[in-house]
């Protein structure tokens, strides 16, 4: 496994906050303006955000809007493009682990990102992913360079 240019805690937090501001806040406001109901009770908004989190990285080379703005993206641990299964594991299964452990999984992720050289969190380990600063194609170039050095 060749982890290349891993992204740390603060940049990942910034990307998550940007995603919340850019995606969730407008959805909440639109829902509230249209229905007059409390948007926090809406399964529709939860479903839209869930689909956004799973599908967009598959079709946009590992980027979500916040990650793209911050220059980071999600890749498989071998540097390849994420798949539906990968994102399902990363979002749904890891989310269930965080819920079942009453937040202890989240604390474990914070510790992992602080102490691991590859900056992989619990949801990265579950899904076989990591978050990188590398642009699409850059990992392959780095892998080719590493092979040439070893020859």
From Swiss-Prot:
Keyword entries, A-Z: Cell membrane, Membrane, Transmembrane, Transmembrane helix
Matches recorded under InterPro entries: Pra-immunoreactive, RDD
Full protein name: Uncharacterized protein YckC
Domain of life: Bacteria
Transmembrane annotation, as ranges: 14-34, 45-65, 91-111
Stored PANTHER family: LMO1584 PROTEIN, PROLINE-RICH ANTIGEN HOMOLOG-RELATED
Topology term for the membrane: Multi-pass membrane protein
Subcellular localization, as worded in the UniProt entry: Cell membrane
Organism: Bacillus subtilis (strain 168)
Classification lineage: Bacteria, Bacillati, Bacillota, Bacilli, Bacillales
One Gene Ontology CC term in the entry: plasma membrane
Alphabetical list of Pfam families matching this protein: RDD (PF06271)
